[in-house]
């Protein structure tokens, strides 16, 4: 793979991106964050982090000391999942492999946070049916799309509107997964309430048409997310917890900017987090997906939403904010955004193809192109074989 063409890098070493910041208990040496990157290399059966490659993959990207790494989305329980090749953190075998990964990250003097991920209607209903598991969402009468509805009915596993007892069970599973993460050596956890997965399905009025205390109003739609946050904070401490949100996202059939009340919904969540913070329970960070990337399967520049921005969050939430979405090819935007001293920048796809991305950002070096075809391929190719800048020069990539 050659370097990215028609891209003029800018050295960002003189910006706030390379100023230290404390996130929870972690003293980061810069503000370029690795956000959660699903890679589908976990081993089936068992949803076990890949024994052959995962340690090396994470160690490569932790090579710059003081880097914050948020792991790929990780299932708290079998019921949370529905993808065979994404990892979990409920079994002894899974925890054993995660322990090795966290150790490798820490040996490079970087930091490991686990993203806790529950799929809901984005799961494969036939995979869940095979394993005797429900196909869950906020409601049972609106599916993610026609294809998912057809799969669910064919598998005799129609979408299930989870009961209040089942919500309580999910909360317990988030708590146990957070405890497992910390026991395995992680520095913290990120609760995934973005990108159309289960917690986001409760936040969005398109997917949530419940009439109980978990639907029907901004406050009720936020209840499940906030219950998870509160329970996990009580279990491991607020300084070890972050929350991810995607106000304008349309991935997995979310409303995004088409929903007129969407900013009010997220402003309420952020306000509740700030209220808790003032009472002594400030989360380590809030992580926002930018309207620049409303759907992670689209390439840079596609699917941008221009009708709003995440700036509203800064006037409500007064803690650190990670912002992720199509920043790597726009260093001029990064230069402006990091002028706010609370801002960190998440770099996703280009951290896949550039294990030394932090060095390249600092010095303004060319970036390796990524190969989208290997994002979710069960192979070492496209996973642990991307070269550093020096290695790429030896391969002649600068001449391609």
UniProtKB/Swiss-Prot annotation:
UniProt: substrate binding residues: 192, 195, 376
- Keyword Nuclease annotated: no
Q: What is its main location?
A: cytoplasm
**EC number(s) on file:** 1.6.99.1
**Gene Ontology biological process:** apoptotic process
Active site positions: 197
Superkingdom of source: Eukaryota
Catalyzed reactions per annotation = A + NADPH + H(+) = AH2 + NADP(+)
Q: Name one GO cellular component term.
A: nucleus
Q: Which cofactors is this protein said to need?
A: FMN
Reply yes or no: does the keyword Phosphoprotein apply: yes
Q: Which CDD domains match?
A: OYE_like_FMN
Q: Where does FMN bind?
A: 38, 115, 244, 349
Ordered alphabetically, the record's keywords are: Cytoplasm, Flavoprotein, FMN, Mitochondrion, NADP, Nucleus, Oxidoreductase, Phosphoprotein
Compartment(s):
Cytoplasm; Nucleus; Mitochondrion
Q: Which residues carry this modification: Phosphoserine?
A: 353, 379
* GO terms assigned for molecular function: FMN binding; NADPH dehydrogenase activity
According to the UniProt entry, the coiled-coil residues are none
* Family the entry assigns: Belongs to the NADH:flavin oxidoreductase/NADH oxidase family.
Q: What does this protein do?
A: Flavin-dependent enoate reductase that catalyzes the chemo- and stereoslective hydrogenation of electron-poor alkenes. The enzyme is reduced by NADPH, and oxygen, quinones, and alpha,beta-unsaturated aldehydes and ketones can act as electron acceptors to complete catalytic turnover. The physiological oxidant remains elusive. Has an antioxidant activity, reducing reactive oxygen species (ROS) levels when overexpressed. Formation of OYE2-OYE3 heterodimers contribute to the induction of programmed cell death upon oxidative stress.
Any remaining note in the record? Present with 15100 molecules/cell in log phase SD medium.
How does this protein assemble?
Homodimer or heterodimer with OYE3.
User: What is this protein's name?
Assistant: NADPH dehydrogenase 2
